[in-house]
Swiss-Prot record:
Gene Ontology annotations of biological process type: cytoplasmic translational initiation; formation of cytoplasmic translation initiation complex
Superkingdom, taxonomy of origin: Eukaryota
Molecular function, one GO term: translation initiation factor activity
Subcellular location per the Swiss-Prot or TrEMBL entry: Cytoplasm
Organism: Nematostella vectensis (Starlet sea anemone)
Keyword entries, A-Z: Cytoplasm, Initiation factor, Protein biosynthesis
Name of the protein this chain belongs to: Eukaryotic translation initiation factor 3 subunit M
Record's function text: Component of the eukaryotic translation initiation factor 3 (eIF-3) complex, which is involved in protein synthesis of a specialized repertoire of mRNAs and, together with other initiation factors, stimulates binding of mRNA and methionyl-tRNAi to the 40S ribosome. The eIF-3 complex specifically targets and initiates translation of a subset of mRNAs involved in cell proliferation.
Amino acid sequence: MDTLLPAFIDAEEQEQAQEIRTFLKEQGADLKEESITPLQDELAEILECCQVCFKEDAELESVMNSILSLVLVVPEKRNELIKKCCDKLKANMSEDENSSAAARLRVLSVLFSGLPEKDPMRHEVYCTQLTIAAKASLVDDIPTELELVKGWLGLWDVDADQRRQVFRLLHGALHDEKRSEEASKVMIELLSTYTDENASAAREDAKSCVVSCLTKPNVLIMDNILSLKPVAVLQGDPIYQLLQIFVSGDVQDYKKFYDSNTDFINSIGLSHEMNLKKMRVLTLMSIGKETDEISYEDLATKLGISSDEIEQFLIEAIQTGLVKARLDQVHRKVIISSVAQRTFGINQWQNLHSRLVKWRDNLLSVRGGLQSVVPPITV
């Protein structure tokens, strides 16, 4: 299907290009009056000075949409011209020109839609959208859903470096807008693109990712981060030791680490009190894997709190959705019904497989029993 974009005038391609050239020259562009051929060379020359129409949003959109409608039909140098369009739209973005950012994004949105969904040049266009939106605080004006973006990257068949470029720009845009939850997910996706061979290049990104997850009160399970190649490169660093404690340690492990690394904890902006709250919930989750009940006194000792604080702590732990438990106030015990897995490795997969097989066998047994007492239905 042919791509249709808004046009400056309704005319043949070369005539449209001549009209755009004339208009830009009238706006002060350093252009000759005579058009040149072939069309791709004409468009390249026009794009060199198209910024003269960026003063007014209406002119910017009209002229750039018309140029792009021609770019998409040229037989040669199409990708080169699209890149030049993107470069022009993201250039000259001084603070006092941010009012035109919305218009630039609208032009890019039209271009993005005008390209086939599997066209690799959509990558260039989307990166330009992210750059402009981040600079002008207009991130809400463009699509940023991680699953959608990952789907696009699969369609465009881009390489690892191009994927990283998108994830890095997307993370920066979301981070600047204080959308930290989404930004963290994007950073994890970015780190997952690295291999053993190049993981060391993402060392600082890995540190940033770990700190970001540790600072979030609602993020408690982090074994997925520990398995990322760039995070593994951090082994031996205090940040890696701290992450290991949050993945599989307990309150006492954290307290020992804090006593030896207080300055480090403070330097990366972590709250000691928040860390303790998270570690207490994580410790209870580990306890719940070993036993289904524990006395107030024993639990208080393991968590480093008083027995009087157990009730309030349990309420907060249950609110995380990772623990199901109740108080037995008569016998001063905590009864633990279930807890989430802190880590999910090969042992957990094998256990899940065994449980599913047992469930399947039970269902087959029930079906066999029913078939033995209920006559088959004939039609």
